[in-house]
Amino acid sequence: ENINYCAEKGIKVLGTSEHAPSMPGAPHYWYFGNLKVVPRVINGVTILKGCEANILDIEGSLDMSDEASKNLDYMIASFHEPVFKPRSREENTLAILNVMDKYDKVEILGHLGNPNYQLNYEAIIKKAKEKDIMIEINNSSLLGSSRIGSDVNCKKVALLCKEIGTKVILTSDAHINTCIGVFNKGIELLKEIQMPEELVMNDPEKLIAHLKSKGRLSDL
């Protein structure tokens, strides 16, 4: 359904990133292992096989082992309230910093603007640049349909990415096919702050080159 929608709309690359198993209602680990049988290109759409992994503790553990994630092209690391209850600013920040040190497959930090999690954005964004990790600009957060109150923080995050020179990626956080590729609020924000184009990783060739530089996508 998602692939056919992308083909109809002329979307060339689809990143699929289902929630990892600790999230209520998420698929079993075997779902992610089975992604190895999904062709790289279907109906002219290149498939990037990912996962939105849950941060479990301040040590930076994720609910995706090396074995479970070995067939993935990338992981998004995110906080979700049912899995990691918000803690102090220092503890929340430490958890994300530790994730970046522990998991090579983490390519994106998800919805940092969530106001329920106080964070030292500067420390996180500086380390993300050092590790060549992208910061998500989440359209759903900016719309206010999820993580209400994120918009102000999202702007702070985007401005720091611009200042520090950290890569960003616009995401739709689509939970239905008709929302795939909907970045309107994210685009508005990046235009408003005059984000340099070279930091925005949504161009298919640029994104694929980024992943290839990390040793991914050997079949492309």
Predicted segments with their positions:
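Ser/Thr-glycine-rich phosphate-binding loops at phosphate-binding pockets of nucleotides
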Residues: 13-19
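Extended substrate/RNA-proximal surfaces in nucleic-acid metabolism proteins
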Residues: 7, 20, 24-137, 191-200, ...
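Short gly/pro/ser/thr-enriched loop/turn and capping motifs at secondary-structure boundaries
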Residues: 21-22, 83-84, 142-144, 176-178
